[in-house]
């Protein structure tokens, strides 16, 4: 996933994510958008690797939730709608 997220998509996800620390968001951007490895991204912004991993999981959870919401807004997208899990 490193370096594979478009910048605009990243900022939209950041807007609705539970991650609020500017330095953590910048480290996530370096990793997800710019393609830095985890250690480089953490070092550039003074974020501990453990905290970064937790923030990355929360960020990925937001992305997965948005993906699951798509069929409710765009039924033609072809995703199967599951009502509850």
Swiss-Prot record:
Record bears the keyword Transcription: yes
Keywords: Activator, Fimbrium biogenesis, Transcription, Transcription regulation
InterPro entries: Adhesin_operon_reg_prot, Fimbrial_Adhesin_Reg
Record flagged with keyword Transport: no
GO biological process: regulation of DNA-templated transcription
SS bond partners: none
Role description: Regulates the transcription of genes involved in the biosynthesis of F1845 fimbrial adhesin.
Protein name: F1845 adhesin operon regulatory protein
Species for this entry: Escherichia coli
């Amino acid at each position: 996933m490193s370096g594979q997220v478009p910048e605009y998509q990243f900022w939209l996800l950041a807007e609705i994510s539970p991650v609020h620390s500017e330095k953590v968001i910048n480290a996530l951007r370096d990793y997800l958008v710019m393609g830095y490895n985890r250690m480089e991204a953490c070092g550039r912004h003074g974020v501990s690797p453990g905290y970064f991993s937790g923030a990355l999981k929360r960020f990925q959870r937001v992305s997965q939730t948005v993906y699951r919401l798509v069929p409710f807004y765009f039924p033609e997208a072809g995703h199967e709608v599951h009502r509850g899990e």
